[in-house]
Amino acid sequence: MANIHQENEEMEQPVQNGEEDRPLGGGEGHQPERNHRRGQARRLAPNFRWVIPNRQVNDGMGGEGDDMEIFMEEMREIRRKLRELQLRNCLRILMGELSNHHDHHDEFCLMP
């Protein structure tokens, strides 16, 4: 009898980790959580901004047009450098074949 009374007291104690009591049966529109950690991650989701670098957080504060323009310019620069490297590689292979007459079947050239 004392054990039952002690168990009831343990069940009535407030939760100390900051979680509130939820009914086990669910309710309207409530889907039971399959995993406690998943539910915890869901509660933490709105506080994700600390993970994002400052540049990206500041993008949402009104400077989106300028940042998009900078991003597009960076992408154009990357594409230009990639084309230049591919062309240089192709020219090296072709010039080497013309002068050496060696077989370069293992090398390839990506032309844009």
Curated annotation (Swiss-Prot):
Pfam families: BEX. One of its GO terms (biological process) is negative regulation of protein ubiquitination. One of its GO terms (cellular component) is cytosol. Residues 1-45 are annotated as: Disordered. It comes from the Eukaryota. Self-associates. Binds to the DEATH domain of p75NTR/NGFR. Interacts with 14-3-3 epsilon (YWHAE). Interacts with DIABLO/SMAC. This is Protein BEX3.
